[in-house]
């Protein structure tokens, strides 16, 4: 009988990546097949996030639901991973004694051994250590699920912003070697992946070891990824302004595979608040980066993160944030009201901004960025955009859907063989959350580089001489 695994994931793209690796790992070692139905599962895993408000209570609320399933099936294994697990550790079992496994983001590769241990003597396992980059050496080969893929290139963060738990839950920065990253991406390209999104809590701080023992920069890595046949789009997230060096900007000038869209968090437009946040850059320095980026890539669009109502934020501080939003003309944002994360320096600051004032500021900020986003979308009307076709449209099974470089969803009429390929689409309609268009060019007319397996290259290029001896003809 097939054993089943259910994973519930909260939080960032790194958590999504980690969850996919958990599924691949447990399929390879134990034959577990994923199920969307928790009631069917033999193992339940909760991959948690501690960024949002009341993250801990959200975890225990979910565990309370799963407790009922365990009462019906005592052999059910329940595991909690991610950043809340890293923060809370064994405290989770003190409140939820029925949890069998507690693991951190850096120990997910040990899940097979943890499950074996629980199956063997029914004793709980807690492992929230930080064994640096070990987890990547223990994971199975990547499996593509569609034309886009996430690839983690580093873990952790050294910046210690006063509001952020990441350095405490994921550890300090550790970069994967460049060869490991490139090999993973080449494997994905051979399976049909056309777009990769390089992941890291502070991704542009990557400093990985090269094959010859030297240390590569993030700019070096971007160019190497762009050279892989079949990879025609590169994204990365999340960046820090202090690490956004001029050599990265030069990659935007000479590497078309790097998309004309960048998510670069700023958090506030007021230098006083940035200082309280421990951001180590000013609003002027941030704008200087954007100015240089737009000199290298004039059509680039920028998204960002904002925290409103940070302790000590005045009306004047908020007005400076709104001025920065107008000056940069952000395309979109992830914006939130400040809520203290336990164990961070900001949790000890006096939260002196009234809740209603926080809500009003958030509303004003989001309305402004929504207006700017719509203005950007309207500029696309009548233009031809290159779309990576991801699958059937959510709006209609008779249509296809894909994304532009600037992350807009586009719905259009097409044929099934277009899925996983690029098409050029003329934008005919603009809506709040999507665009509509018509296909004007297919991939066959674009001259793109397509990844091939070694076997297909040999089959295509192998020739035989007059006596039947094979030889290679490139």
From Swiss-Prot:
<keyword id="KW-0949">S-adenosyl-L-methionine</keyword>
<feature type="domain" description="Radical SAM core">
    <location>
        <begin position="143"/>
        <end position="375"/>
    </location>
</feature>
<keyword id="KW-0411">Iron-sulfur</keyword>
<dbReference type="GO" id="GO:0046872">
    <property type="term" value="F:metal ion binding"/>
</dbReference>
<dbReference type="Pfam" id="PF00919">
    <property type="entry name" value="UPF0004"/>
</dbReference>
<feature type="binding site">
    <location>
        <position position="161"/>
    </location>
    <ligand>
        <name>[4Fe-4S] cluster 2</name>
    </ligand>
</feature>
<keyword id="KW-0004">4Fe-4S</keyword>
<keyword id="KW-0819">tRNA processing</keyword>
<dbReference type="GO" id="GO:0005829">
    <property type="term" value="C:cytosol"/>
</dbReference>
<protein>
    <recommendedName>
        <fullName>tRNA-2-methylthio-N(6)-dimethylallyladenosine synthase</fullName>
        <ecNumber>2.8.4.3</ecNumber>
    </recommendedName>
</protein>
<feature type="binding site">
    <location>
        <position position="83"/>
    </location>
    <ligand>
        <name>[4Fe-4S] cluster 1</name>
    </ligand>
</feature>
<dbReference type="GO" id="GO:0035597">
    <property type="term" value="F:N6-isopentenyladenosine methylthiotransferase activity"/>
</dbReference>
<comment type="similarity">
    <text>Belongs to the methylthiotransferase family. MiaB subfamily.</text>
</comment>
<dbReference type="InterPro" id="IPR020612">
    <property type="entry name" value="Methylthiotransferase_CS"/>
</dbReference>
<feature type="binding site">
    <location>
        <position position="12"/>
    </location>
    <ligand>
        <name>[4Fe-4S] cluster 1</name>
    </ligand>
</feature>
<keyword id="KW-0963">Cytoplasm</keyword>
<dbReference type="GO" id="GO:0051539">
    <property type="term" value="F:4 iron, 4 sulfur cluster binding"/>
</dbReference>
<feature type="domain" description="TRAM">
    <location>
        <begin position="378"/>
        <end position="441"/>
    </location>
</feature>
<dbReference type="InterPro" id="IPR007197">
    <property type="entry name" value="rSAM"/>
</dbReference>
<keyword id="KW-0479">Metal-binding</keyword>
<dbReference type="Pfam" id="PF01938">
    <property type="entry name" value="TRAM"/>
</dbReference>
<feature type="binding site">
    <location>
        <position position="49"/>
    </location>
    <ligand>
        <name>[4Fe-4S] cluster 1</name>
    </ligand>
</feature>
<dbReference type="InterPro" id="IPR023404">
    <property type="entry name" value="rSAM_horseshoe"/>
</dbReference>
<dbReference type="InterPro" id="IPR005839">
    <property type="entry name" value="Methylthiotransferase"/>
</dbReference>
<keyword id="KW-0408">Iron</keyword>
<dbReference type="InterPro" id="IPR038135">
    <property type="entry name" value="Methylthiotransferase_N_sf"/>
</dbReference>
<keyword id="KW-0808">Transferase</keyword>
<dbReference type="Pfam" id="PF04055">
    <property type="entry name" value="Radical_SAM"/>
</dbReference>
<comment type="subunit">
    <text>Monomer.</text>
</comment>
<dbReference type="InterPro" id="IPR013848">
    <property type="entry name" value="Methylthiotransferase_N"/>
</dbReference>
<dbReference type="InterPro" id="IPR006463">
    <property type="entry name" value="MiaB_methiolase"/>
</dbReference>
<comment type="function">
    <text>Catalyzes the methylthiolation of N6-(dimethylallyl)adenosine (i(6)A), leading to the formation of 2-methylthio-N6-(dimethylallyl)adenosine (ms(2)i(6)A) at position 37 in tRNAs that read codons beginning with uridine.</text>
</comment>
<dbReference type="InterPro" id="IPR002792">
    <property type="entry name" value="TRAM_dom"/>
</dbReference>
<feature type="binding site">
    <location>
        <position position="157"/>
    </location>
    <ligand>
        <name>[4Fe-4S] cluster 2</name>
    </ligand>
</feature>
<dbReference type="InterPro" id="IPR006638">
    <property type="entry name" value="Elp3/MiaA/NifB-like_rSAM"/>
</dbReference>
<feature type="binding site">
    <location>
        <position position="164"/>
    </location>
    <ligand>
        <name>[4Fe-4S] cluster 2</name>
    </ligand>
</feature>
<feature type="domain" description="MTTase N-terminal">
    <location>
        <begin position="3"/>
        <end position="120"/>
    </location>
</feature>
